[in-house]
Amino acid sequence: MSISIVKSDNPYVLDYIEGKDTMPALTRKNADFIEAVVRLDSNYAKDILYNPPSDGYDPEMNVSDSGGKFCGSSEYWFKEMMKEPEYYRCLLGAVIAVDTTNSTHLEACLNGRKTVCDIIYKCAPNVESLIDKLNEPFNPNNKNHLISLISKGLPAKGKVGLRYNISFATKFCAYAANSLDASERSSKYDDVVSDALPEYSKVYLNEPHRKSQYKIMQHRQKKMNELEKHQYRLDVFGEYSDCIKRILKKIDYVINRDELDHIIWYAYKGDVK
């Protein structure tokens, strides 16, 4: 199946799928342009580089509130944990940095950031064991996978019920794998990408799907218990991740998972044209 792409000679104009002028193609040119845009984004630019926290910032003292200080980049904390004896402190710093940059709202759970850090620390008490956990391929039925452990339901603040942090779990593992050079790479589960992915599946894989194929839908959970709700999220992410993997294979890996994520996210958020 051939994919028709409308290409522009202008390096600052995206290539698009023919007949879909709002759907950027998954090309090397588009990836290079979007990655340049990412590096101009004040939030993400700081996080993808080694940027230490503000003077006086301590992740253990500023778990839920930075007090107006910069909490440090996730790249900083992951690199530091390979050389600093205070592994737990660096792990907590990384949790806070990923949560802050991606607005995944761990603090909507009771003691969310600290609790999630403790969950990771329990199964990966040092950087070597963390890399080992990151190297495990994701399987939605593996209850000991790091994504599964992190995304278990936690008590939500101010209301009855649990909150599942699947977006944070996948993003933490993706950031950690990149920074620590793990062999396995995780996709980041994202609302914007999950909205657009069915259309990319149709174009690149010739697999038509309903618009909500890769969405976590509240109405489907009405009769589920807490364990089933957690498994449902893992299953949706498993399909989402597998779709991305097959699309990348289809285009001969001319871009990677992060670049696909960025092309879709920035284009569909309206930040680039």
Residue map of PLM features:
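Short alpha-helix boundary/capping elements
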Residues: 42, 100, 176-180, 268
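Residue-level detector of well-ordered alpha-helical segments, enriched
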Residues: 87-92, 164, 168, 189, ...
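Aromatic-enriched hydrophobic runs in primary sequence
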Residues: 75, 92, 98-127, 168-172, ...
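Helix-hairpin-helix/helix-loop-helix acidic hairpins
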Residues: 70, 75-76, 80, 85-164
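Catalytic DNA-binding helix-loop module of base-excision-repair DNA glycosylases/AP lyases
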Residues: 148-199
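C-terminal accessory module of base-excision DNA glycosylases/AP lyases that mediates lesion recognition
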Residues: 2-75, 80-81, 185-273
